[in-house]
A protein has these predicted regions:
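Residues marking the start of alpha-helices
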Residues: 1-2, 62
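N-terminal helix-turn-helix DNA-binding core of bacterial DNA-binding proteins
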Residues: 2-38
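Key DNA-contact positions within bacterial/archaeal DNA-binding proteins
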Residues: 41
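Short, hydrophobic-biased segments on the C-terminal half of alpha helices
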Residues: 47-48
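A short, conserved structural fragment
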Residues: 51-61
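Basic, amphipathic "hinge/linker" alpha-helix immediately C-terminal to the N-terminal HTH DNA-binding motif
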Residues: 62-75
Length: 75
């Protein structure tokens, strides 16, 4: 089982992803950066960390999707 203990910062990213997906049906790195008012490299680092924990499906240049565990954590 993957480690799903996350910092409050990563939880903020998960919540932002969930909100963007709810509004637009998908979330891209730029949309997440704009939503959280952070730089895109910060988003990329956070997405890689969330993906490593099995909370999102992330691939460069593709939309980000929450896994069931990610959706539960974001709720």
């Amino acid at each position: 089982m993957k480690n799903t203990t996350i910092s409050s910062s990563l939880e903020d990213y998960l919540e932002a992803i969930a909100e963007i997906i709810e509004e637009q049906g998908h979330a891209h790195t730029k949309e997440i950066a704009d939503h959280l008012k952070v730089k895109m490299p910060s988003v990329t680092n956070a997405l890689q960390a969330l993906s490593a924990r099995g909370l999102i499906h992330y691939q460069s240049h593709s939309p980000v999707f929450l896994t069931p565990a990610g959706a539960e954590t974001a709720a």
